[in-house]
Amino acid sequence: MTENNFDWHDIVNNVDPVLGKNFLELSEHIIEQESEIPKKYKELILMACLATSCNNKGTRHRGYEAMHQGATDKEILEALALASLAAGFSTLSESIGSLSDQFTIEPSPST
């Protein structure tokens, strides 16, 4: 898996601040507006899309936002599992790893 070492938002804002501002306003509008898709599901969809592109930072951020909007561990896992059907099963392990400290599960007892 390849993780980019740069923040593309910073590059866009540096090269074309107007484009950066417009993109930020558009993305905030799409995510924040009240619509037929509740915010929790928007965040789950975005998280799954980011997982398919191996964007661990984005997957973690959107997963955290989905949890903040009420998504359960099971909903997070199901969305990531669906993403792995499109992108391969390594997507599932990578994306779970990026969110591992956010899950509320208890560790298995040692036998």
Mark where each language-model region is.
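Alpha-helix C-capping/helix-to-loop hinge sites
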Residues: 29-33, 48-52, 83-86
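Short alpha-helical linear motifs
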Residues: 64-71, 87, 98-107
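Acidic, glycine/proline-rich low-complexity segments that act as flexible tails and inter-domain linkers
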Residues: 1-41, 94-111
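Amphipathic, charged-and-aliphatic alpha-helical interface segments
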Residues: 42-56
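C-terminal structural segments of small proteins and small subunits
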Residues: 77-102
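Residue-level signature of transmembrane alpha-helical entry/exit and packing/kink sites
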Residues: 40-43, 78
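Residues at alpha-helix boundaries and short interhelical turns
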Residues: 35, 52-56, 70, 87-90
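Mid-chain, well-packed structural core segment of small domains
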Residues: 53-81
